Amino acid sequence: LSTTFSNGYDQVAIIGNDCLDLTPEILTHTFTELETQETVLGPAKDGGFYLLGLRRFDALLFKNVQWCGAQVSDQISANIGQLHRSLAILPTLKDIDSYRDLFNWLCQTQTANRWLIRYLRHLLLQTEFRQMFIPPVIRHRQLCRWKWQLPPPA
């Protein structure tokens, strides 16, 4: 982060790659908030965060943060307060940390990423992928309702 700011950037947003509900609108809103706020935080439902927007870097922002815990977002928020920086909070979103999280996300009817859902369902139904990555517990019971998407076996 310090290198990014030293290269002349005056607004930086760090995003996680496991939050499938992050939208371009949220990113746009982040940079709009950074016009008036020093920090923007997008908390995740599991206690982490999916986005951190900054106008300047300070290593103390990450002091005493217990990474991969359920209090990461709260600890960063507390550090922001101790540094007397203004903070905008984004909507809380889910991130994907397990197969169950991915399955639940795929089953949401309100998810707008229909192309991604179709692609992931197709990928999950591929025999090689299922054997390598899908636990046996969910192989047939939960994925069989999507088998209609594939042509019948030859």
Residue ranges and their predicted role:
Residues 1-2:
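Portal/gating segments that form or line small-molecule/metal binding sites
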Residues 9-17:
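Short beta-strand-to-loop acidic/aromatic patch adjacent to the donor-nucleotide binding site
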Residues 19-47:
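Conserved donor-nucleotide/metal-binding helix-loop-beta segment in metal-dependent transferases, i.e.
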Residues 44, 55, 63:
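Active-site rim beta-loop-alpha module in soluble metabolic enzymes
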Residues 50-57:
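Conserved beta strand-loop-helix elements of the APE1-like EEP
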Residues 58-77, 140:
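Short, glycine-/small-residue-rich phosphate/pyrophosphate-handling segment
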Residues 78-154:
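Conserved alpha/beta core of the MobA/IspD/sugar-nucleotide pyrophosphorylase nucleotidyltransferase superfamily
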